[in-house]
């Protein structure tokens, strides 16, 4: 699996992920890029699950963003509908974390679109470790969103065997 974490704080939203791709109990690749920018750099998206499945979902999600002029929530709801009802998409096993300047969402293959509390998303096998670390840092420090995401990924990578220390981090400034 993997670890993807997204943190929203004050003037930025950050999303990061590790780079490990596993096949069973074998590490196949250590520098995969599981977090990327979409829709002219205005949206950050990350995936946990099958790599091929994630690329399909990224393409579908970006098409929905184009169709709905970058409206993140609308695009997420439409992707979730397609994912739940389309026979081919239903077989895909992945979770998407998406964020823009206004919202952070988790999209699942069950048709769920979830806006988490405190602007904190953590998915994948290392998600619970990253979430615990990020929540503690959010509540007890003044660190920025990207510093919290980086540290949460580091901690998850130390604990989860399916998460490595090769990280990708994307940051979107939030302007008032």
UniProtKB/Swiss-Prot annotation:
Its annotated compartments are: Cytoplasm
Give me the Gene Ontology terms describing cellular component. HslUV protease complex; proteasome core complex
Explain the regulation of its activity. Answer: Allosterically activated by HslU binding.
- Residues binding Na(+) are 157, 160, 163
Query: Which PROSITE patterns would you find in this protein's record?
Result: PROTEASOME_BETA_2
Q: What is its EC number?
A: 3.4.25.2
Q: Where are the transmembrane segments?
A: none
Catalytic residues (positions): 2
- Primary location group: cytoplasm
Q: Name one GO biological process term.
A: proteolysis involved in protein catabolic process
Q: Please tell me which top-level EC class this enzyme sits in.
A: hydrolase
- Which InterPro entries does this UniProt record tie to the protein? ATP-dep_Prtase_HsIV_su (IPR022281), Ntn_hydrolases_N (IPR029055), Proteasome_sua/b (IPR001353), Proteasome_suB-type (IPR023333)
Q: Which UniProt keywords apply?
A: Allosteric enzyme, Cytoplasm, Hydrolase, Metal-binding, Protease, Sodium, Threonine protease
Listed GO molecular functions?
metal ion binding; threonine-type endopeptidase activity
Which reaction is this enzyme known to catalyze? ATP-dependent cleavage of peptide bonds with broad specificity
Q: What does this protein do?
A: Protease subunit of a proteasome-like degradation complex believed to be a general protein degrading machinery.
User: What does the similarity note say?
Assistant: Belongs to the peptidase T1B family. HslV subfamily.
Please describe the quaternary structure of this protein.
Answer: A double ring-shaped homohexamer of HslV is capped on each side by a ring-shaped HslU homohexamer. The assembly of the HslU/HslV complex is dependent on binding of ATP.
* Name of this chain's protein: ATP-dependent protease subunit HslV
State which gene encodes it.
hslV
């Amino acid at each position: 699996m993997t670890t993807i974490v997204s943190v929203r704080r004050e003037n930025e939203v950050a999303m990061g992920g590790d780079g490990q791709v596993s096949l069973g109990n074998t590490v196949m690749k250590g520098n995969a890029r599981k977090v990327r920018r979409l829709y002219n750099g205005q949206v950050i998206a990350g995936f946990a699950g099958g790599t091929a499945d994630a690329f399909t979902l990224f393409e579908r999600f970006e098409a929905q963003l184009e169709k709905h002029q970058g409206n993140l929530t609308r695009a997420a709801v439409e992707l979730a509908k397609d994912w739940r009802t389309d026979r081919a998409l239903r077989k895909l096993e992945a979770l998407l974390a998406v964020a823009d300047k206004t919202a952070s969402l988790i999209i699942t293959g069950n048709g769920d679109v979830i806006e988490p509390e405190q602007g904190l998303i953590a998915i994948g096998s290392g998600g619970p470790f990253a979430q615990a670390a990020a929540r503690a840092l959010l509540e007890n420090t003044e660190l920025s969103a990207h510093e919290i995401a980086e540290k949460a990924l580091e901690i998850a990578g130390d604990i989860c065997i399916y998460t490595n220390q090769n990280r990708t981090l994307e940051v979107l400034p939030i302007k008032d």
